[in-house]
Amino acid sequence: MGIFRGPNIVRDGLTVLLDSRSSRSYPGTGTTWYDLSGNDNHGTLYNFTGPSAGSTSGFDTTTKLMMYDRHVGTSDGTANNYVRIPNSDSLDNCLITNGMSISFWFRQDVYRCTAMTKWNSSWEVYYCSSLVFRTQGTGGSDLNTGDTALSGFHNICVTSTSTGRKVYVNGVVQATGTNTVSTQNTTSNVSIGAYDGGAYAMEGSLPYYALYNRELTSDEVNQNYNALKSGFGI
C-alpha cells in the first residue's frame, strides 16, 4: 500500500502510520490494520470483537475509532485485544540507539495501568497515574512525567536520540532525560494497546499511531499535533 497523502503531518522518517479513521488504513472489516507509511508495517488485530456500531472491543463503525476493552480478571492477558506489528528491517531503524519517535492519540475510558505500546527489550510507553517512557536493553531506564491526568483524547509523543529523550503531551514537553542505552534486542514484535500477548491492556481508544526512525523536533511534534487535533475534538 502506497504512502497516504492526508493531513499535513511530518513524513520524514515515518516508518509506521496506522489511522483507523481512514478507510485505506482500516477498511471496516478484517484483522489487518494497514500501514499508510509505505513500509508495509501492517498491524494484525488480536481478540477484537467488532466491527459494530458502538463497539468497545474493536472498530466502532459509527466513530471510526479503534476501541480496546480490557477483560478484567484475565491474569494472562490472552482474552484482551491488542495490535501486533511484526518485526521488519524498517522497524529495526527505530531503535533508541538510532533515534526514534512515537506519536499516538489515546483516550482512556476506564482507568487502568496500561501499556500503550511496547517493543520488547527496546522501548515501552505506559500509563499508571503518570506517563513513563521506558528504554530497555543495556543501560535502559524509565523517564517519568509524574502525576499526569489524562481525560478525553490526548496526543502522546515520545522522542529519543542516542543521548537524550523527551515526553510530550499535546505538544508540550512534560519530561526530559538522558539516555544511556548501548545495546538492544531487535527481533520482537511491536504491540499497541497492551503487551504482545495481551497483558496490561488498555480500556479506551487508540485509533492513530505513528512511529518514526528519528527524533522529531519540538516544532515537528507541534506540527503533528496541530494537524490532527481538530479530528479529536481539541
Indicate where each model-derived feature is located.
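Short, solvent-exposed beta-strand-to-loop segments that form ligand-recognition rims
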Residues: 170-190
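Short, aromatic/His-centered strand-loop micro-motif at the edge of beta-sheets
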Residues: 132-155
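Beta-strand-rich interaction surfaces with strong enrichment in secreted/lumenal proteins
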Residues: 91-93, 143-148, 179-180
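Extracytoplasmic low-complexity segments
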Residues: 1-79, 221-234
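Localized edge beta-strand/strand-to-loop motifs within extracellular or lumenal beta-rich domains
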Residues: 152-166
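Extracellular glycan-recognition modules
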Residues: 28-29, 33, 37, 46, ...
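Extracellular glycan-interaction patches encoded by glycine-rich segments
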Residues: 1-2, 89-90, 136-144, 186-207, ...
